[in-house]
């Protein structure tokens, strides 16, 4: 039977509950356990698919097409286990499910209430489908005290009573701030956070305390006394250089041992930390470094590109180099010459995005990379802009544009109206809803055997995750290929372009999918490993 770990947060948001959950899962895996992680988000959106990147950060897409919280990306990267639709729930989805049941008459005329109907729906989500796992870690989004989080906290409180004794453990992640004027760390915020949690009926078994410096033993004893937890269960979570240092740091502090002890597992299997130690060693002992320009439109919030950032660092791990990122707002190039910004970098990456803002700047970045022979990686929107650049400057179609930006006489990029998903034909209309209407999830692509991208993959058949509503127009394929832009990958039915490349360029590849979503520290995605390898070669020329 599965054991459950519920992870809550207090004092402030953005403390790193997702990283903590992922790191603990990795530590339990290192001891040979089968682990699943689930995220419970209190917001009323059905999913984050239509939320602004500035509000929510990245939307992480799973193989089965779920648009989910970026924390699921951390879960996948740390554990290697692909997430799915059933690993993330929101208040919006819960209420939608309940309303659908009420309309069908499933509640037999009962008054539908938060307790028991909403809490039961949450509990069903937590408990469903866990037969093959030893541990299920549930991260509760938000902060203790938030109104939105109350039904979730009530649900996990009830589960603590309903699950067999010894199969539920509560971890509370808090902040212990340092006050310079006093010259000391303060325990009071954590005390109040635990008091709030206990007033709901949840007594934390373990405190995971974030701090920017070593927590004195006297302060740990104080937290133990006032928060009613064992002294050994007050675990300090100090700031570290990279997120991939977190599992090792938590292991040294005894988090995994304390969790197993709370479950009464003694003796516990010995952990194998060699893979994490190797990753940490490579990160802290690079044999060189490269600089990659990321030309985007959400550069003010790096969380909007979380998986992309990590995939680039994974490419650095594969090549034993440090990857420095030069963030450039694409709109800058619409009023300034790109050359001073891009001449000194070793690679240019144009990531995914939506809308017209910054598009011309991204087109200019693709033009610079093509003409100057700088490695270029265009992902989703970045591939589309590379095709528009080629249409304008190589084919001579001056009005080449995307129908996403408005009516155009030359829609080199256009709205997809239908595509195959397995054996089913998916259809969309331009006037349809935005939420959940994109081409989402893993789709197959077929690569030309003699293409550069097929050599990188070592295969001509690939499966990658997609999230897009627009696609390069197949009607322009012949003219673009005649100008030198090779359509190296297509959907199996030959209708949707998936990858493009220039044969006479050291490394210029555009992909319609999002390879960053499948990259792992232990298994860097081949495209990112190859891109960084090309950047290393470019660094010798600059």
Swiss-Prot record:
Q: Which residues bind UTP?
A: 13, 186-191, 222
PROSITE patterns to which the protein is assigned, alphabetical: GATASE_TYPE_1
> GO terms for molecular function, please?
ATP binding; CTP synthase activity; glutaminase activity; identical protein binding; metal ion binding
Amidoligase domain: annotated span:
1-265
Where along this sequence does the record place binding of Mg(2+)? 71, 139
* Activity regulation annotation text: Allosterically activated by GTP, when glutamine is the substrate; GTP has no effect on the reaction when ammonia is the substrate. The allosteric effector GTP functions by stabilizing the protein conformation that binds the tetrahedral intermediate(s) formed during glutamine hydrolysis. Inhibited by the product CTP, via allosteric rather than competitive inhibition.
A Gene Ontology biological process in which this protein takes part is: 'de novo' CTP biosynthetic process
Keywords from UniProt, A to Z, are:
ATP-binding, Glutamine amidotransferase, Ligase, Magnesium, Metal-binding, Nucleotide-binding, Pyrimidine biosynthesis
**What is catalysed by this protein?**
UTP + L-glutamine + ATP + H2O = CTP + L-glutamate + ADP + phosphate + 2 H(+); L-glutamine + H2O = L-glutamate + NH4(+); UTP + NH4(+) + ATP = CTP + ADP + phosphate + 2 H(+)
According to the entry, every stretch annotated as the Glutamine amidotransferase type-1 domain falls at: 291-541
Q: Which residues bind ATP?
A: 14-19, 71
Q: Which residues are involved in binding L-glutamine? A: 54, 353, 381-384, 404, 469
Which Pfam family is an annotated match for this chain, by its short name?
A: GATase
Positions annotated as active site in the UniProt record: 380, 514, 516
Q: Where does CTP bind?
A: 13, 146-148, 186-191, 222
- Which HAMAP family did the record assign? PyrG
Which PANTHER family does UniProt cross-reference here?
CTP SYNTHASE, CTP SYNTHASE-RELATED
Similarity remark: Belongs to the CTP synthase family.
**Further remark:** CTPSs have evolved a hybrid strategy for distinguishing between UTP and CTP. The overlapping regions of the product feedback inhibitory and substrate sites recognize a common feature in both compounds, the triphosphate moiety. To differentiate isosteric substrate and product pyrimidine rings, an additional pocket far from the expected kinase/ligase catalytic site, specifically recognizes the cytosine and ribose portions of the product inhibitor.
Summary of subunit composition and partner proteins: Homotetramer.
Protein name, per record: CTP synthase
Q: Which organism is the protein's source?
A: Brucella ovis (strain ATCC 25840 / 63/290 / NCTC 10512)
Instruction: State the organism's lineage.
Output: Bacteria, Pseudomonadati, Pseudomonadota, Alphaproteobacteria, Hyphomicrobiales
Q: Which gene encodes it?
A: pyrG
